[in-house]
Amino acid sequence: MSGNTFGALFTVTTFGESHGPAIGCVVDGCPPGMSLTEADIQPFLDKRKPGQSKYTTQRREEDKVQILSGVFDGKTTGAPIALLIQNTDQRSRDYEDIKNLFRPGHADFTYHYKYGHRDYRGGGRSSARETAARVAAGAIARLYLKRYLNLDIIGYLQQMGDLKLQFENENEINKNPFFCPNNKQIQELADYVDRLRRQGDSVGARVKILARGVPTGLGDPVFDKLDATLAYAMMSINAVKGVEIGAGFNAVEQLGSHHRDQMTAKGFLSNHAGGILGGIATGQPIEVSIALKPTSSITTPGQTINTEGEEVTVVTKGRHDPCVGIRAVPIAEAMMALVLMDHYLRHKAQCK
């Protein structure tokens, strides 16, 4: 199985399965001399880890990270940084009844026909459990970008199902389990999730990610445009079905006289381009939105086939998120950080 490594100079290779003994990653290309401890990485993992509230999956993982290499006396050495996270709350028996079935909307069918032999427990390698390793790697990138460039990344929930959230206060985002920027809508979100659980169903979401303090010039045309890399990175996240940069699909209805980001001696007058022109960062905030589908792991019975091609009914018994978009926020932040870190090192290698 190929395709487990991301990046050009700052690379991340993840490994492990949902119900295996552990997951982890190897980060290569981190500059030497940066202070780094497990305690630096842990808060980012705590933000993503399951079982923190009744509104997400009830699988409970501590997600304690171990640094195995690449750090000596509290500083990075420039060598590959290996990170390990133990899986401690697997419940593989939940999947015994469906090991020979293809869950609708999941990778079971495609993994079976591509590889012939798959780990059916919790989706194996295709599970969003893998993203914990991305968040750990992204933490290293975020720490570097913040300390050396004063670059900040923030993500939040924009919409859950048909409930659109009004942006009120950035300080509210990390004070609630929904990463919602409006404390007046928290109860609406809570009621929505409770209703989904009772119905045995799920719903999609829209998440926005912002990066501020991005140096002008990051990005490499033509195939490695910054926005192209961001779209590639975001689409690699489980359940993501769409990516917008800046105005995104709203640009279809805009006139050129409105969409163009006019400039003055003091700077740009708007940011419909989302901080990127010609694939290169303008220095404005980078704005990315992602659309996530509703998870197919629901208790409502559904039609499918088994490995013999016979039609059967399936009910998923595992512990799952009614809305995967909630915990996608820290994952998308991590992918933004990995892209920007990689492009920053590439920019330094080529330009002054």
From Swiss-Prot:
Binding site for FMN: R125, S126, S127, N238, A239, G278, K293, P294, T295, S296, S297, R319
Enzyme Commission code: 4.2.3.5
UniProt-listed InterPro entries: Chorismate_synth (IPR000453), Chorismate_synth_AroC_sf (IPR035904), Chorismate_synthase_CS (IPR020541)
Reaction(s) this enzyme catalyzes, per UniProt: 5-O-(1-carboxyvinyl)-3-phosphoshikimate = chorismate + phosphate
Cofactor requirements of the protein: FMNH2
PROSITE patterns: CHORISMATE_SYNTHASE_1, CHORISMATE_SYNTHASE_2, CHORISMATE_SYNTHASE_3
GO biological process: amino acid biosynthetic process; aromatic amino acid family biosynthetic process; chorismate biosynthetic process
Disulfide bonds: none
GO CC list: cytosol
Record bears the keyword Metal-binding: no
Pathway stated in the Swiss-Prot or TrEMBL entry: Metabolic intermediate biosynthesis; chorismate biosynthesis; chorismate from D-erythrose 4-phosphate and phosphoenolpyruvate: step 7/7
Cofactor stoichiometry and binding remark: Reduced FMN (FMNH(2)).
Subunit structure: Homotetramer.
Main function: This reaction introduces a second double bond into the aromatic ring system.
Record's protein name: Chorismate synthase
Organism: Legionella pneumophila subsp. pneumophila (strain Philadelphia 1 / ATCC 33152 / DSM 7513)
